[in-house]
Amino acid sequence: MGDMPFWKTKSLDEMTNAEWESLCDGCGLCCLNKLEDWDTGEIAWTSIRCTLLDGENCRCKDYDNRQATVPDCVQLTPKAVREISWLPPTCGYRLVAEGRDLYWWHPLVSGDPETVHAAGISVRGRTVAEDGIEIEDYEDYLVTWPLEVGLEPVE
């Protein structure tokens, strides 16, 4: 058991900060704007990314201070991961919370932060910045691919 990776031996609550942060695969999916139907609670995804998400490297441009710039940025915690229904099905936090293993393309498994992009999981090249887009126009950017990434094997 000593040679098993930490995500197979620890719960989210038991992880160090460094282990916790490394569970993020860098896909950027959680930083896409989502719309919620007030009647049904259904979540609809858009291709509109947060103003702080870099569309190419799929990382936050100001991670440490993100909530000062984007007050509604969701801070992932073990409790939040267990409660948030919209985390992508491939999310490392979600997978570990559900007792499942990380995918082959996750940087912790592959050893390479580029595999999440090469496997077609990330938002790289598929988004537009939210800056200048009116909220009433968000429906023009509805997409389903965030819930479909990772379902088909990459050729």
Curated annotation (Swiss-Prot):
It holds the Pfam family CxxCxxCC. InterPro entries: Puta_zinc/iron-chelating_dom, UCP006173. Belongs to the UPF0260 family. This is UPF0260 protein NGR_c07710. It comes from Sinorhizobium fredii (strain NBRC 101917 / NGR234).
